[in-house]
């Protein structure tokens, strides 16, 4: 037996993989080979040549030939070799380096495979092989995906570093230009000061020269008149005075030069101080601008939240008053004078309530609760939506929809058996009083809302144009606010602020020749505002889901947004997936942006519309909203048609039951 086979056989005997075979491991192997218990200690001592209490590989290889006949270790080695060869053959059937993909689990899996192979269970062996193949394939796919993500991250870091380098270079150029300009100005001022001092000094020298010439002439004239001795004495005195005056002038000149040097040093200090103060002023100005912008943003959102809180309080008061009035009217209906009439009343529509009659106060309270939940979910909590759509959902006292909704939920008519007992005029008076009480309670509740309508809004509500709610969704930075600004005002701003909470706009469009009002809600894309976005998805008719074509992360998060939308809505609503910022694709390297093919495949998977747009250039902005509005219009019409069919079938079923059973 060669060295490799001996090494493999020694590893099989080494149960704990410690590199040496102890007595317990040797005993286990001997029992598997049916060696008598009396001979185990003798055989172990033959292997343990150095007597240290365990068998290393040198002892094992030296004494193997001597005790191989007793232990039959060769047959054990051949068996292990065949099992190892089976694992190697299976490993060759897999693509790539299996040990590289399995890592530290390779040894355990190979031993498990050898154990299963030794049992000759083909079904279990096939299942284990399929499991290993699937595991290797999945690990390979994960590694490829990790490499792709690392490549994307590396590209993003390179782009960011290049942009930072360009910004630093521009800033450095601006600083150099500013420093050069300041130096030139200060040098010009210094040259002017030195020139003025030189002119002054030259004038003083000219005056001195004139004085010397005048004194020289006087001396010559006096020398002619006086004796030579007196002339010489006077001349010496004059020369001495002139020399003293010349020394004084020189001293004053040196002092002036020293003053100029001191002024130059002070000027340099003032320059440095001016530069530092200018930088400090710029930093403080930037901080102040940021603080002002944050203050304005927080103030606007605080006002919005206060208005929303006020609306919720007013809505709560209205619901309480409506509940109390309904309880009072129920008690009046249960009085002995009207005992015959309520006993035979039945509801006109029961789509929003259970199908029992109004025979007790508990059913009435349940109906009022359903009515409250319906109107709280219809958008009353948002003040801006009330102001914009005051003529549709919650209008003034003359609103047809408000009265009709309350009438369908609460109005009562006599049953068929009651027609013969009660006069029609009395029934009509009772129905009018019931509807009037509910309508008056609704009017009192709505009067608490600060609704302000001008003449144009009243005209719009009279036209009864259909209103659809569209929600803008997507990651932060995908261009939702710019998309809404381009749609509403046909403008683009590069310095638009990040949306905090929600934003709201109304767009009037002609959809298939019909005037349509679109409420478009811009939701914030940050994680902390996801709960706010879910509440708007719940009552939306359609969703504009945006992603940035230059950002793979925003595209990958589209699936998460779709799941949130489906979790928030009771049924599937129309969606339009929009790839924004296509104008930036030409400036990016090929392959770094999300292609339109991937966007189309994703939209097909979710049965949604798809287009690519540019809020900066205005490309496909109106078209995307128009197509989604058409789908929303179709969806709403189908929903109303199915709802009317369900109500009709329920009405027929009740009529059949009443005819059969006399209810």
UniProtKB/Swiss-Prot annotation:
Biased amino acid composition, Polar residues = 324-336
What Gene3D superfamilies is this protein classified in?
Answer: EF-hand, P-loop containing nucleotide triphosphate hydrolases
Gene Ontology CC: one annotated term: perinuclear region of cytoplasm
Keywords linked to the UniProt accession: Calcium, Coiled coil, Cytoplasm, GTP-binding, Metal-binding, Nucleotide-binding, Repeat
Annotated region Disordered: the residues are 324-343
Q: Which InterPro entries match?
A: EF-hand-dom_pair, EF_Hand_1_Ca_BS, EF_hand_dom, P-loop_NTPase, Rab, Small_GTP-bd, Small_GTPase
Q: Which SUPFAM superfamilies match?
A: EF-hand, P-loop containing nucleoside triphosphate hydrolases
Please give one Gene Ontology molecular function term for this protein.
GTP binding
EF-hand domain mapped to chain residues: 1-33, 35-70
The entry's Ca(2+) 2-binding residues are 48, 50, 52, 54, 59
Gene Ontology terms describing biological process: vesicle-mediated transport
The record lists GTP as bound by 477-482, 580-583, 615-616
Q: Where does the secretion signal sit in this chain?
A: none
Output the superkingdom of the source species: Eukaryota
In this chain, Ca(2+) 1 is annotated as bound at 14, 16, 18, 20, 25
Does this entry carry the keyword Glycoprotein? Answer: no
Note the subunit structure.
Answer: Homodimer.
Chain's role: Binds predominantly GDP, and also GTP.
Q: Identify the PANTHER family for this entry.
A: RAS-RELATED PROTEIN RAB
Q: What is this protein called?
A: Ras and EF-hand domain-containing protein
Higher taxonomy: Eukaryota, Metazoa, Chordata, Craniata, Vertebrata
